[in-house]
């Protein structure tokens, strides 16, 4: 008879083996990939937190400051967090801290892959899948695409711009980039509506991706129609009709998609609260990004700079061609850049030009002859550009599009629960600014070492709801000691009750 991997793991967790350090570091033969992952993860955390006399993980770490402990102060690219990283109590904060200090990614379970497929299917149902270079054989054979941070960010911003325009023409947009800034001194989110001055030295970038935006109108009419493909025409019409938005009853609702392995929402209150807070962060970010387009333009440029990107470096010409093929609404804007026309955005129009730029290349002509290119595309392949195509341009257009959203964003937020690609339940709730502020202060205090870890309350109910599903359940001194104390207290109370009964 052979032992299953899980049985081997249980044997190796026995005290007799745990107390033997050479054996502790060894891996049981034929261990599964998940088992090996757990051994490595727990060993990593033990090296950071230490163990008690029983070999279990300690639950506090002296001088803990996750942001400084885990991110390189000399590397600007690491000077940011994600919205999900601020949800420190979505499960148990102790597990969250252990996972951080393990420095390992989450194990890729089957349900995570299934969830990603659902998100991708929903995205593809709303937006035409982006054409990849390998999808056009003559493209990869003719020109070279660059995939560094600059060009990945430019493509992401270009995609977000076109998706926001799509929102005003179709009523839906998915996978929308947003970001905000957290003041590490005050533990508050940056809010341009307040008197606080945005100081990059005090603010940490927080990034997020909104699953779903929905635009509705009382009269059923949307500001744009499918004929508005040009970026310039679309933004011009939105500007001209913005005063009519309120009259037409336009509203934008922010939603998050959660995938489930079964048709029920998570029973843990902390998980439900975290999802709501996630949406509140997104709402705050969209409001902030749309308040002042000039300020948002600067925030976007700073976002790029802390990633180590030069916002004035011209894009690789082949990447510009790819953007035109994927999103032909940009062709007209590129012609304006070539001619040196203004965009009625002084911060961009008056920015100094430090590089020359051209798309003129025999390879590009040859390539465009083999595809159904935009009628204006050929013009772009002749001569130099008065203004190069840079990240500054995309920051300007994205700032303008964000500014269209702010007056329309609803107080009502929504969670969409999916199972097997089907939405089985929607939960709608109202934004709670006070709860968001409290959560942000708590999360910031955790990340910058201003408070101790706050594990889930040690109760039998929580043990069944949280601890039984935790990777650290057999190594957690917090829950073991807490339950032992509660059991001892229960025994003492029972003895007292018996003595009283016998009096």
Swiss-Prot record:
Its EC number is 3.1.-.-. [4Fe-4S] cluster binds at residues 92, 467, 470, 476. Its cofactor is Mg(2+); [4Fe-4S] cluster. GO terms for biological process: interstrand cross-link repair; mitochondrial genome maintenance. One of its GO terms (molecular function) is single-stranded DNA 5'-3' DNA exonuclease activity. The keyword Transmembrane does not apply. One of its GO terms (cellular component) is nucleus. Pfam families: Exo5 (PF09810). It is an enzyme of class 3 (hydrolase). Binds 1 [4Fe-4S] cluster. Keywords: 4Fe-4S, DNA-binding, Exonuclease, Hydrolase, Iron, Iron-sulfur, Magnesium, Metal-binding, Mitochondrion, Nuclease, Transit peptide. It comes from the Eukaryota. InterPro entries: Exo5, EXOV. It is found in: Mitochondrion. Single strand DNA specific 5' exonuclease involved in mitochondrial DNA replication and recombination. Releases dinucleotides as main products of catalysis. Has the capacity to slide across 5'double-stranded DNA or 5'RNA sequences and resumes cutting two nucleotides downstream of the double-stranded-to-single-stranded junction or RNA-to-DNA junction, respectively. Belongs to the EXO5 family. PANTHER family: EXONUCLEASE V (PTHR14464:SF4). Monomer. This is Exonuclease V, mitochondrial. It comes from Candida glabrata (strain ATCC 2001 / BCRC 20586 / JCM 3761 / NBRC 0622 / NRRL Y-65 / CBS 138).
